[in-house]
């Protein structure tokens, strides 16, 4: 029996460079809307990106000083409700920014997704962001017709966010695909660690906030997937498999990476299908 390969994309920083003009802006507008005593700079947000998940980043604010300044009750259940409310508002703002076209798709995303679909590959997106945000970016990046072919794994469907491998282990299980037959496109060290932890070979397309991170476990590190138009060629930053990729990363390149034996990892996950992102 011939196995069907799968191409799994992260969302933020991979489909589009969403962090500074999308998520950061949406967080700060949410803080202002609710009168919260915080505003993140670009440098602040770069540190926040070490924490996987938007709700988790909001929860990191809840120091005793912040709780007092924001006039929040000490009851943790009420605090959790406040975080959920802030996060819903942030997601609405972010989705509106995506719909407004503030964040263009990164080079090569639509091209390689279309090529994979035409070749019969399984398509998926695995992200710690809220599902409405992920679907909005995906639709903007590849178009509604192609986006409908993607399986989306997002938000709180797993209890442990990246760099835990849970989201990728779940995706493989739900897609019915072995790690030998799947390849991931990521942009961050946390995402790479999650994918490699699930035994997946990974191509990293560095983004604005991740250029200086450690990608030593990646199968290939590039500036982008590239497109065959002036100014959109990829730059190969690390090529440990000696693929010798050209000005664009093609489905042939991904297939060659899949032909390389992977390192197997044991992963144990706990996921929640009932929790809304």
Residue ranges, per PLM feature:
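Substrate-recognition element of Asp-dependent hydrolases with the DxDx(T/V) motif
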Residues: 27, 104, 109-139, 195
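Conserved G/P- and acidic residue-centered "switch" motifs that form tight phosphate/ATP-binding loops
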Residues: 10, 14, 127, 187
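A broad detector of the eukaryotic-type serine/threonine protein kinase catalytic domain
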Residues: 95, 99, 121, 157-158, ...
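N-terminal helical cap/lid subdomain that shapes the substrate entry/recognition surface
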Residues: 2-11, 15-107, 114, 118-119
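Conserved long hydrophobic alpha-helices within structured protein cores
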Residues: 22, 26-27, 51-63, 126-138, ...
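N-terminal-biased segments
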Residues: 62-69, 122-128, 141, 150-153
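Asp-based, Mg2+/Mn2+-dependent phosphohydrolase catalytic module
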Residues: 2-4, 114, 130-277
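Residue-level detector of short coil/turn "hinge" positions at structural boundaries
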Residues: 38-40, 69, 123, 145, ...
């Amino acid at each position: 029996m011939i196995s069907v390969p799968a191409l799994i994309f992260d969302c933020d920083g991979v489909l589009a460079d969403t962090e500074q003009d999308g998520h950061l802006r949406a967080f700060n507008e949410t803080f202002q809307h609710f009168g919260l005593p915080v505003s993140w700079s670009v440098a602040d947000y770069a540190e926040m990106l070490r924490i996987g998940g938007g709700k988790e980043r909001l929860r990191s604010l809840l120091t005793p000083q912040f709780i007092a300044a924001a006039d929040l009750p000490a009851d943790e259940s009420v605090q959790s409700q406040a975080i959920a409310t802030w996060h819903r508002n942030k997601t609405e703002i972010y989705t509106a920014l995506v719909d407004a076209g503030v964040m263009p798709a990164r080079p090569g995303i639509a091209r390689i997704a279309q090529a994979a679909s035409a070749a019969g590959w399984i398509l998926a997106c695995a992200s710690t962001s809220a599902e409405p945000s992920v679907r909005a970016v995906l639709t903007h990046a590849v178009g509604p017709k192609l986006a409908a072919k993607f399986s989306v794994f997002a938000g709180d469907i797993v209890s442990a966010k990246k760099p835990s491998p849970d989201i990728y282990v779940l995706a493989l299980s739900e897609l019915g695909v072995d790690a030998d037959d799947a390849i991931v496109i990521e942009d961050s060290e946390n995402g790479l660690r999650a994918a490699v932890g699930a035994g997946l070979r990974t191509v990293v397309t560095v983004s604005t906030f991740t250029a200086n991170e450690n990608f030593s476990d990646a199968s290939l590190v590039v500036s982008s997937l590239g497109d065959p138009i002036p100014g959109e060629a990829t730059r190969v930053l690390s090529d440990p498999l000696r693929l010798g990729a050209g000005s664009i990363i093609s489905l042939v390149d991904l297939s060659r990476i899949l032909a390389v034996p992977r390192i197997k990892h044991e992963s144990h996950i706990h996921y929640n299908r009932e929790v809304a992102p």
